[in-house]
Amino acid sequence: MFTNYEKRLVETNGVHIACRIGGKRPALLLLHGHPQTHVIWHRVADTLAEHFTVVAADLRGYGDSDKPDAQQLTYSKREMASDQVGLMRKLGFDRFVVMAHDRGARVAHRMAADHADAILRMALLDIAPTLAMYEQTDETFARAYWHWFFLIRPAPLPETLIHADPVGYLRSVMGTRHAGMAAFTDEAFAEYLRCLRLPGTATGICEDYRASAGIDLVHDREDRSLGKRLPMPLKIFWGEHGVVGRCFDPLAEWRRVADHVSGGALSCGHYIAEEAPQALLAATLDFLQGNNGDVGSSLS
């Protein structure tokens, strides 16, 4: 996995963010979701590195990134977005392109709202805006995304149950989607399991979700009350066999908060980069390349 990529641990915003870096062209930041790490991109990373300097990062609380103690704002998407902008600046990229999945796409949404000048364009995978998803939650969504409501329970109950059976937790979250466990290589699954077992990961995951059900909604409602919109081009893709497209209208919801939105469904489930890597590359590569003259290209 990740041929010719370099591993780095970069200090920024008071934490260390783990990442892999590969390629020698304009900058592309890749962000993963729950309960995974940057390894979700392993099927597309080498191709992307032919066109970009790819930075595949672990979010705070996940993978080999720091997992700070939970406080009110520690795992807000505002803080997590600042981590990633700081990472890119430390690497020499003031402006860059983003592709992000699941929780990483929620971080990318906040990044685009708070640091619009840094983001040239974004591809977001299998989410609708967090506020829309909470406000439109119904029985179908709650049953399918049970973990949203399990992980926000007060500590230490969810953390204790995850630690008691991390393999079972991963299989219950990842293996019950459209493609089952067949979407994940043994090597990738072993890496997800290793990282879930690290001290602080279960807490980081839970605090990520607790923030989304709390302070992140406050920030999103503030943006809505101010009429704040995302100005950069967005490509929105979701799994044809997943929950997001069944329970929400992704393009309509993103058009409520952003000015330039296009995209559609791909023939897969939730874990797009692992289930349908070639379809993802075909759908996103031209968009991600865009006007490459605007993208920084230095690496320190």
Task: Name the predicted role of every residue range.
Residues G269-L281:
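Catalytic histidine-centered segment of alpha/beta-hydrolase-like enzymes
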Residues P35, E50, A116-D117, D259, ...:
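Proline-centered flexible-loop/turn and helix-kink motifs
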Residues F2-R8, V15-I17, A27, V55, ...:
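Flexible "cap/lid" subdomain of the alpha/beta-hydrolase fold that forms the substrate-access gate
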Residues W41-H42, C247-F248, P277-Q278:
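Conserved strand-to-helix beginnings and helix N-cap segments that scaffold or border functional pockets
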Residues D286-S300:
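Generic C-terminal helix-cap and adjacent flexible tail
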Residues V15, R20-K67:
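Conserved HGGG/HGGXW glycine-rich cap/lid loop of the alpha/beta-hydrolase fold
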Residues R43-D46, E50, A113-D117, A282, ...:
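Short, well-ordered alpha-helices that flank and scaffold nucleotide-derived cofactor binding pockets
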Residues G23, G33, A100, G269-I272:
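Structured beta->alpha junctions
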